[in-house]
């Protein structure tokens, strides 16, 4: 027997085909509450799209510990080899709108939510180990260059190359973006990275700096520019389709989860800033340590409820993991949580996809769409109620040693913008170098001469062959 159709308030609907009217040809009636409710709700079905990472795909899965790292962290999800934790992972493009193609040249978001017994822990990463900028003060400016021109409403190569030519620290990420890895073949065939430096804290209160890596077990596959352009027209949801259908047929994608670790003493003695997200840590000096396996094995039942409303943020942490002085990371701690409060709502953590799987006891109350609000329990602290939530000093992080005066320090005092990009270029095969040069020259064609000349010097500083290749691709005579 089928269910009875109801209004949102549960009243049975007698007729869902015809509006109430004054006679068969007369005007409609305002007392048709079913019509009014249906139209009013339809007008409000959409929520604001994400300012970045608007186009995305998601799936549930598990994280399984394969190596004991309790020497580094007291987080309970790592307490035993073989332990499994439920996860939700959202992939995305960065600059495109919600209806943009999955095959655009763009970094990919790689955001993982771990539903642990101590709360939700999020690693909000990308498919690249670095980023374009170091300071969050420049993030709105940077994102504006990745969006549409304010007059023409078109994507504009002039503005993003102009921005990069004034931001030489972007060169490392630009080199990755225009390499063969700039257009992954779907989401299953790419690595993920936490990108930032984070911290792990063990039971003795000792802090270790860490970088997170997610190595695809499906193998790296990328799309040639011509294939990506074709798919953008014939199957713009290519990556979404590939991920969804693979999971539906039981071909579950997996990633090997690894860390790099650095002691506080090592970090303090390094000339290079270990908290600079435009640079990587040498895997020769800081080798990858396998930690576990991440597997995606269940598709969401409702895209809007579980993917569109999913809210990730680096402020979501659990005991045993922490942040670092990485400037971009610290900016994101505020920006992401604030974006969710605007986009999804004050109580976005109460939605099923965002809700912790452990008890939540706080003094936060009310707000739009609040559920429960802890009944008659006190809404202030400290209080005299024995059963009310109390702070837990044993979960305090160890003190972080700092030095220096409060000021606006010039992050460009570290002017080594080129060595990492140059090293990456020299690691590439001749075929990969040719593709990189072709991709860059193709997008720079038509950009103003002053921008080209300013950017060109960065390529030369990274590696003379890099600069010569771009110059030749642009038809610039260096003689």
Swiss-Prot record:
Pfam families: Catalase, Catalase-rel. Activated by peroxide. One of its GO terms (molecular function) is catalase activity. The keyword Transferase does not apply. One of its GO terms (cellular component) is cytoplasm. The keyword Iron applies. Disruption phenotype: Loss of catalase activity, loss of growth on 5 mM H(2)O(2). The active site is at residues 53, 126. GO terms for biological process: hydrogen peroxide catabolic process; response to hydrogen peroxide. It comes from the Bacteria. Keywords: Heme, Hydrogen peroxide, Iron, Metal-binding, Oxidoreductase, Peroxidase. Its EC number is 1.11.1.6. Residues 1-25, 350-376 are annotated as: Disordered. Residues 1-21, 361-376 have a biased composition (Polar residues). Transmembrane segments: none annotated. Its cofactor is heme. It is an enzyme of class 1 (oxidoreductase). Heme binds at residue 336. It catalyses: 2 H2O2 = O2 + 2 H2O. The major expressed catalase protein in strain Corvallis in stationary phase. Decomposes hydrogen peroxide into water and oxygen; serves to protect cells from the toxic effects of hydrogen peroxide. Belongs to the catalase family. This is Catalase A. It comes from Pseudomonas putida (Arthrobacter siderocapsulatus).
């Amino acid at each position: 027997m089928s269910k009875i159709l109801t209004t949102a308030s549960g009243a049975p609907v007698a007729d869902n085909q015809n509006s109430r009217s004054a006679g068969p040809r007369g005007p409609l009636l305002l007392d048709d509450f079913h019509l009014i409710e249906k139209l009013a709700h339809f007008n409000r079905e959409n929520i604001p799209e994400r300012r970045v990472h608007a186009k995305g795909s998601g799936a549930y899965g598990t994280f399984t510990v394969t190596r004991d790292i309790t020497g580094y962290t007291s987080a309970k999800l790592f307490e035993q080899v073989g332990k499994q934790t439920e996860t939700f992972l959202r992939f995305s493009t960065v600059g495109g709108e919600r209806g943009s193609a999955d095959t655009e040249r763009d970094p990919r978001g790689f955001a993982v939510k771990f539903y642990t017994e101590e709360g939700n822990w999020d690693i909000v990463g990308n498919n690249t180990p670095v980023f374009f900028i170091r300071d969050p003060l420049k993030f709105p400016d940077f994102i504006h260059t990745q969006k549409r021109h304010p007059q023409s409403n078109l994507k504009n190569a002039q503005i993003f190359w102009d921005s990069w030519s004034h931001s030489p620290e972007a060169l490392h990420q630009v080199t990755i973006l225009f390499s063969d890895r700039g257009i992954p073949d779907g989401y299953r065939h790419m690595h993920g990275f936490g990108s930032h430096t984070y911290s792990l804290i063990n039971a003795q209160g000792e802090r270790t700096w860490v970088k997170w890596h997610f190595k695809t077990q499906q193998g790296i596959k990328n799309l040639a520019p011509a294939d990506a352009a074709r798919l953008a027209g014939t199957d713009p949801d290519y990556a979404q389709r590939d991920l969804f259908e693979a999971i539906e047929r039981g071909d579950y994608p997996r990633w090997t989860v690894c860390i790099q670790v650095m002691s506080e003493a090592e970090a303090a003695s390094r000339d290079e800033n270990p908290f600079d997200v435009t640079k990587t840590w040498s895997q020769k000096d800081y080798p990858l340590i396998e930690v576990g396996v991440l597997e995606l094995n269940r598709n969401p039942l409702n895209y809007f409820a579980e993917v569109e409303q999913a809210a990730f943020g680096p402020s979501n942490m659990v005991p045993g993991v922490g942040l670092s002085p990485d400037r971009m990371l610290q900016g994101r701690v505020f920006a992401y949580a604030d974006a969710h409060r605007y986009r999804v709502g004050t109580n976005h953590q109460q939605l099923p996809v965002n809700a912790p799987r452990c008890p939540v006891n706080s003094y936060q109350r009310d707000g739009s769409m609040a559920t429960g609000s802890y009944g008659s329990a006190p809404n202030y602290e400290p209080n005299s109620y024995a059963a009310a939530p109390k702070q837990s000093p044993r979960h305090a992080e160890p003190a972080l040693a700092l030095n220096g005066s409060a000021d606006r320090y010039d992050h460009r005092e570290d002017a080594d913008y080129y060595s990492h990009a140059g090293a990456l270029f020299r690691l590439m095969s001749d075929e990969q170098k040719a593709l990189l040069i072709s991709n860059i020259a193709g997008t720079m064609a038509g950009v103003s001469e002053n921008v080209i000349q300013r950017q060109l010097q960065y390529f030369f500083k990274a590696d003379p062959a890099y600069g010569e290749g771009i110059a030749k691709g642009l038809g610039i005579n260096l003689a």
